[in-house]
Protein backbone atom coordinates (compact mmCIF):
# COMPACT_ATOMS: atom_id res chain seq x y z
CA UNK A 1 0.00 0.00 0.00
CA UNK A 2 1.25 3.49 -0.80
CA UNK A 3 0.88 6.11 1.92
CA UNK A 4 1.76 9.79 2.39
CA UNK A 5 3.70 10.40 5.59
CA UNK A 6 2.19 13.17 7.72
CA UNK A 7 5.25 13.28 10.01
CA UNK A 8 8.76 11.86 10.15
CA UNK A 9 8.75 8.11 10.81
CA UNK A 10 11.99 6.40 11.86
CA UNK A 11 13.42 4.01 9.24
CA UNK A 12 10.65 4.93 6.78
CA UNK A 13 10.78 8.54 5.62
CA UNK A 14 10.14 12.21 6.22
CA UNK A 15 7.07 14.42 6.12
CA UNK A 16 5.38 14.44 2.73
CA UNK A 17 7.09 11.43 1.21
CA UNK A 18 5.01 8.83 -0.59
CA UNK A 19 6.27 5.41 0.50
CA UNK A 20 5.20 1.83 -0.09
CA UNK A 21 4.57 -0.17 3.09
CA UNK A 22 2.89 -3.45 3.92
CA UNK A 23 -0.88 -3.25 4.21
CA UNK A 24 -0.97 -4.35 7.86
CA UNK A 25 1.64 -1.77 8.91
CA UNK A 26 -0.39 0.98 7.27
CA UNK A 27 -3.81 -0.18 8.51
CA UNK A 28 -2.81 -1.13 12.05
CA UNK A 29 -0.15 1.46 12.93
CA UNK A 30 0.49 4.38 10.57
CA UNK A 31 -3.09 5.37 9.73
CA UNK A 32 -4.63 4.96 13.25
CA UNK A 33 -1.74 6.94 14.80
CA UNK A 34 -2.29 9.68 12.17
CA UNK A 35 1.27 9.32 10.93
CA UNK A 36 0.16 8.59 7.35
CA UNK A 37 -2.75 8.60 4.87
CA UNK A 38 -3.48 6.46 1.84
CA UNK A 39 -1.80 7.95 -1.22
CA UNK A 40 -4.80 8.65 -3.45
CA UNK A 41 -4.82 11.52 -5.94
CA UNK A 42 -7.26 13.48 -3.75
CA UNK A 43 -5.19 12.86 -0.60
CA UNK A 44 -1.98 14.00 -2.33
CA UNK A 45 -3.66 17.22 -3.52
CA UNK A 46 -5.11 17.87 -0.05
CA UNK A 47 -1.72 17.23 1.54
CA UNK A 48 0.01 19.73 -0.76
CA UNK A 49 -2.46 22.39 0.43
CA UNK A 50 -1.70 21.61 4.10
CA UNK A 51 2.05 20.99 3.65
CA UNK A 52 3.22 24.37 5.00
CA UNK A 53 1.03 24.05 8.10
CA UNK A 54 2.26 20.50 8.82
CA UNK A 55 5.90 21.51 8.30
CA UNK A 56 5.43 24.42 10.73
CA UNK A 57 3.93 22.09 13.37
CA UNK A 58 6.80 19.60 12.88
CA UNK A 59 9.38 22.40 13.24
CA UNK A 60 7.72 23.62 16.46
CA UNK A 61 7.76 20.10 17.93
CA UNK A 62 11.45 19.73 17.02
CA UNK A 63 12.34 23.11 18.55
CA UNK A 64 10.47 22.28 21.77
CA UNK A 65 12.20 18.90 21.98
CA UNK A 66 15.62 20.48 21.40
CA UNK A 67 14.98 23.05 24.14
CA UNK A 68 13.94 20.30 26.57
CA UNK A 69 16.96 18.25 25.47
CA UNK A 70 19.35 21.08 26.33
CA UNK A 71 17.88 21.28 29.84
CA UNK A 72 17.94 17.50 30.25
CA UNK A 73 21.51 16.98 29.00
CA UNK A 74 23.88 16.12 31.82
CA UNK A 75 21.14 15.61 34.41
CA UNK A 76 21.62 12.99 37.10
CA UNK A 77 18.67 11.17 38.62
CA UNK A 78 18.89 9.21 41.86
CA UNK A 79 16.62 6.23 42.40
CA UNK A 80 16.67 4.23 45.64
CA UNK A 81 15.83 0.53 45.49
CA UNK A 82 16.19 -2.29 48.00
CA UNK A 83 19.27 -4.41 47.36
CA UNK A 84 21.42 -7.17 48.76
CA UNK A 85 24.90 -6.70 50.16
CA UNK A 86 26.50 -7.45 46.78
CA UNK A 87 24.72 -4.51 45.10
CA UNK A 88 22.20 -6.57 43.16
CA UNK A 89 18.70 -5.14 43.38
CA UNK A 90 15.62 -6.93 44.66
CA UNK A 91 13.51 -6.21 41.60
CA UNK A 92 14.73 -3.74 38.99
CA UNK A 93 14.58 -0.14 37.81
CA UNK A 94 12.44 0.06 34.68
CA UNK A 95 11.82 2.79 32.14
CA UNK A 96 8.61 3.78 33.95
CA UNK A 97 10.58 4.29 37.21
CA UNK A 98 13.07 6.49 35.36
CA UNK A 99 10.31 8.49 33.63
CA UNK A 100 8.57 9.00 36.98
CA UNK A 101 11.80 10.25 38.59
CA UNK A 102 12.43 12.65 35.70
CA UNK A 103 8.85 13.93 35.94
CA UNK A 104 9.37 14.63 39.65
CA UNK A 105 12.41 16.73 38.69
CA UNK A 106 10.22 18.78 36.34
CA UNK A 107 10.88 17.14 32.97
CA UNK A 108 7.86 15.92 31.00
CA UNK A 109 9.07 12.46 29.91
CA UNK A 110 6.92 9.45 29.11
CA UNK A 111 8.07 5.90 29.76
CA UNK A 112 8.07 5.13 26.02
CA UNK A 113 10.74 7.79 25.53
CA UNK A 114 13.22 6.12 27.90
CA UNK A 115 15.49 3.68 26.06
CA UNK A 116 16.98 0.76 28.02
CA UNK A 117 18.77 -1.32 25.35
CA UNK A 118 20.02 -3.93 27.85
CA UNK A 119 16.72 -4.17 29.71
CA UNK A 120 15.84 -3.02 33.23
CA UNK A 121 18.65 -1.93 35.55
CA UNK A 122 19.36 -4.69 38.09
CA UNK A 123 22.60 -3.50 39.71
CA UNK A 124 23.25 -0.49 41.96
CA UNK A 125 25.55 2.18 40.55
CA UNK A 126 25.67 4.74 37.74
CA UNK A 127 24.01 3.94 34.42
CA UNK A 128 23.76 6.09 31.28
CA UNK A 129 20.30 5.93 29.73
CA UNK A 130 19.10 7.42 26.43
CA UNK A 131 15.92 9.50 26.40
CA UNK A 132 14.36 10.00 22.94
CA UNK A 133 12.45 13.29 23.12
CA UNK A 134 11.92 13.36 19.34
CA UNK A 135 13.03 11.17 16.44
CA UNK A 136 15.95 13.59 15.94
CA UNK A 137 16.61 14.47 19.61
CA UNK A 138 18.14 11.76 21.82
CA UNK A 139 19.71 12.80 25.13
CA UNK A 140 21.85 10.79 27.56
CA UNK A 141 20.89 10.98 31.24
CA UNK A 142 22.85 9.47 34.13
CA UNK A 143 20.78 7.31 36.47
CA UNK A 144 22.31 6.64 39.89
CA UNK A 145 20.73 3.57 41.45
CA UNK A 146 21.28 3.57 45.21
CA UNK A 147 21.06 0.19 46.91
CA UNK A 148 19.17 0.27 50.21
CA UNK A 149 20.47 -2.60 52.41
CA UNK A 150 17.41 -2.69 54.65
Swiss-Prot record:
Pfam families from the UniProt entry: Ribosomal_L9_C, Ribosomal_L9_N
Instruction: Print the keywords alphabetically.
Output: Ribonucleoprotein, Ribosomal protein, RNA-binding, rRNA-binding
The terms under GO molecular function for this entry are: rRNA binding; structural constituent of ribosome
Offer a single GO CC term for the protein: ribosome
Q: Which GO terms describe its biological process?
A: translation
Outline what the protein does.
Answer: Binds to the 23S rRNA.
The Swiss-Prot or TrEMBL record describes its family as follows: Belongs to the bacterial ribosomal protein bL9 family.
Which NCBIfam families does its entry note? L9
| The protein's name in its UniProt record | Large ribosomal subunit protein bL9
Organism encoding this protein: Janthinobacterium sp. (strain Marseille)
Amino acid sequence: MQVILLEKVVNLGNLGEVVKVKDGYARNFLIPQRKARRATAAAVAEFEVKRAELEKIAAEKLAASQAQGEKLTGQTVQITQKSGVDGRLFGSVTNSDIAEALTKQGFAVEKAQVRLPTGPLKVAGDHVVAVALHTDVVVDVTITVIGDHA
